[in-house]
Amino acid sequence: MADSVLIAAGGTGGHVFPALAVADALRAQGVEVTFAGTATGMEARLVPERGYTLHTLDMQGLRGKGIRRWLRAPWRVSRAILQARRILRQTRSHVVLGMGGYVTAPVGIAAWTLGRPLCLHEQNAVAGLSNRLLAPLARRVFLGFPGARLARGEWVGNPVREAIHALPTPQERFHDRKGPVRLLIMGGSQGAQVLNAVSAAALSGMTDAERPAIWHQTGRDHAESTRAAYAQARIDAKVEPFIDDMAAALGWADLALCRAGAATIAELAAAGLGAILIPFPFAVDDHQAANARFLEKAGAARMLRQEGLDALQLRDVLRPLLADPELRLRWAEAARRQAKGDAAATVAAACIECAGGIDA
């Protein structure tokens, strides 16, 4: 029987997209891959769309929640572990790969109780609670950033879709471009209201000659209001709730304005694209700021804090970048130097190695 891997990943695109990149690498080697997640996270749409089976657990995050949720936590976690054990038996998975997010904890514990090898991948520069708890139980632990602190962690980078790695170099992409500078605005898989609110106002204060072309991902509920803001400012912009073909968007852009989720940072590096990064200020342990500093220290980005951010400040930061193609190219090339293109293959190979000799 072919090797079988159960991938636990859920919640936001920051967990799901890297998990799908590893899944594709496993499937290319003949491994049977199934997913464990929730019915409410992005995995509920993205995983089936990519041709994988998703088994759902009744599980919710706890950090930052009210006291009632914490009081119910032991019962919810216990139930989720039992659900995960049933899924592992049903799928006859040889190995579990935890890709972070709260769904990883019950699936990882279930794997340990059944004697199945557990591999973990931590996407962020600050390790999440689930991975910190599970790391002592894991056979292999992989890190998306070199500064993340997990026991026995190996820095491999964050898995990224192959289509993004396959983009031409920044020099090749930028060489013959004509017309306005191309600005990609994206708030992660769920959008960012601060970017939706401030971008049109910042760009409206520019002349027609300096204003860039815009491709803006708003998140599910904010496309119409953002289109209206651009229309009121008399700015022509391509506005979408969600960009399905991120490789096309990154390949199109000269510069990005975005959040600093782990998947976003990895995709900017893989593509080779400089960025103005505005970390989500309420991220657990402020991990998006730590992610952003990775590219900023490499000379590939500038980090702005959301607190106090207004249209004037953003306009002042954008103007020199829009006016200087050599600066944009330097940022893009610096970003590309941070890419680790073999992350998905490395994690997939470790899962296959751990599956050796396991009778599911």
From Swiss-Prot:
Q: Does the keyword Manganese apply?
A: no
Question: Into which family does the record put it?
Answer: Belongs to the glycosyltransferase 28 family. MurG subfamily.
Describe the function of this protein: Cell wall formation. Catalyzes the transfer of a GlcNAc subunit on undecaprenyl-pyrophosphoryl-MurNAc-pentapeptide (lipid intermediate I) to form undecaprenyl-pyrophosphoryl-MurNAc-(pentapeptide)GlcNAc (lipid intermediate II).
CDD domains listed in its UniProt record: GT28_MurG
Organism superkingdom: Bacteria
Mind listing the UniProt keywords for this protein, alphabetically?
A: Cell cycle, Cell division, Cell inner membrane, Cell membrane, Cell shape, Cell wall biogenesis/degradation, Glycosyltransferase, Membrane, Peptidoglycan synthesis, Transferase
Look up and give the membrane topology term.
Peripheral membrane protein
Checking InterPro entries in the record gives:
GlcNAc_MurG (IPR006009), Glyco_trans_28_C (IPR007235), GlycoTrans_28_N (IPR004276)
The pathway it acts in is: Cell wall biogenesis; peptidoglycan biosynthesis
CC terms in the record's Gene Ontology section: plasma membrane
Q: What is its main location?
A: membrane
Q: What class of enzyme is it?
A: transferase
Query: Can you say what this protein is called?
Result: UDP-N-acetylglucosamine--N-acetylmuramyl-(pentapeptide) pyrophosphoryl-undecaprenol N-acetylglucosamine transferase
Show the catalytic activity.
di-trans,octa-cis-undecaprenyl diphospho-N-acetyl-alpha-D-muramoyl-L-alanyl-D-glutamyl-meso-2,6-diaminopimeloyl-D-alanyl-D-alanine + UDP-N-acetyl-alpha-D-glucosamine = di-trans,octa-cis-undecaprenyl diphospho-[N-acetyl-alpha-D-glucosaminyl-(1->4)]-N-acetyl-alpha-D-muramoyl-L-alanyl-D-glutamyl-meso-2,6-diaminopimeloyl-D-alanyl-D-alanine + UDP + H(+)
MF terms in GO: UDP-N-acetyl-D-glucosamine:N-acetylmuramoyl-L-alanyl-D-glutamyl-meso-2,6-diaminopimelyl-D-alanyl-D-alanine-diphosphoundecaprenol 4-beta-N-acetylglucosaminlytransferase activity; undecaprenyldiphospho-muramoylpentapeptide beta-N-acetylglucosaminyltransferase activity
Which GO biological process entries does UniProt record here?
carbohydrate metabolic process; cell division; cell wall organization; lipid glycosylation; peptidoglycan biosynthetic process; regulation of cell shape
- Quote the EC number: 2.4.1.227
Q: Where in the cell is it found?
A: Cell inner membrane
Question: Which residues does the record give as UDP-N-acetyl-alpha-D-glucosamine binding sites?
Answer: 12-14, 124, 161, 189, 243, 288
Alphabetized Pfam families for the sequence: Glyco_tran_28_C, Glyco_transf_28
